[in-house]
Amino acid sequence: TPPGRFILFDSLRDKDTIRVLREAKEPVVSALDELKDKGIRSIRDFYADPARLELAQGLDEFRRKKLMASCDNYAILREALWMLYARPFDPVRFGQLISAHHANLRDGLGISTPEIEQILQTAMANGAYGGKVNGSGGGGCCYVYCATEDAEKILRAVEAQGYPGHILKGDKGNCVEA
């Protein structure tokens, strides 16, 4: 568990999960299918050989934008995963990665909402390192990552705008101890 806290917020906006996921996924799957004859089987192929991203230039703008956002999010995921095991841990960079992931979801895949953006902007203005939509997007929840000492202030600022939140406490979970 990284140091600091995660705060989960509810945007109080209903969403159509199946529609949101379909609209984000189908163009990426279609783009990958079109690139199959060029040796592309998955997003991981672009991560393994970034020069292959040039192949996306032959796609229409709509699918290219969604594919590129998905490729970038995979690279962000890999860096963030590596950071969780790195010492010393850099909470500021970790927050930046979370926000960069959200930017791809918002700008590339179109799955944020004005409510989610308001929550994230308020949290960032009050000290959060980063934040993103949670789950399928299109409404629902988001979370932010922050220093432990800033969590209550961030929670109060966002709740003052009418969005309930909950500070999450990390735990190592179930494990086998020798």
Regions inferred by a protein language model and the residue ranges of each:
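N-terminal pre-core extensions flanking Radical SAM catalytic domains
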Residues: 138-144
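C-terminal nucleotide
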Residues: 1-130, 144-178
